[in-house]
Amino acid sequence: MVTIEDVRAIVAGLDRAYEAVVRDRVKFRVGRIVFLAFSRDERMMGFAFPKDERAALVASEPDKFLLPKPGDMRYQWVVVRLDAVDLQELRELVEEAWAMVVPKRLSAAYFATVNPDGSGNPDGSGARDAPGAPPTR
């Protein structure tokens, strides 16, 4: 199972990202924008995700992904159960959430560095269409 420590290690390599504790919950931000937030027990992680694609994501893997609580439905947000993802998928979720809140040039430069062939995927699969695109499932 992945943990918050795995997320911290991933976030450490992302420009402008930092950790904050708000109301006893760990959150990761760029500026004032939250792109990751943990439940108090750190077993679930909310992450930035395109609002118009989240229903399909949750429907595709309902044991892994959840819609946000009703009060947060207005945000571009999805929740993942950490015990249901591996480290590679966690990395993709974290990187893509971060890419949603930073300037496109910054995310493009990061993904070009992660995979110099320009695909944006560390595995070189080329499945990533463009910087800031949601993770391929």
Regions found by a protein language model. Name each.
Residues 1-137:
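Charge-dense, helix-prone N-terminal extensions
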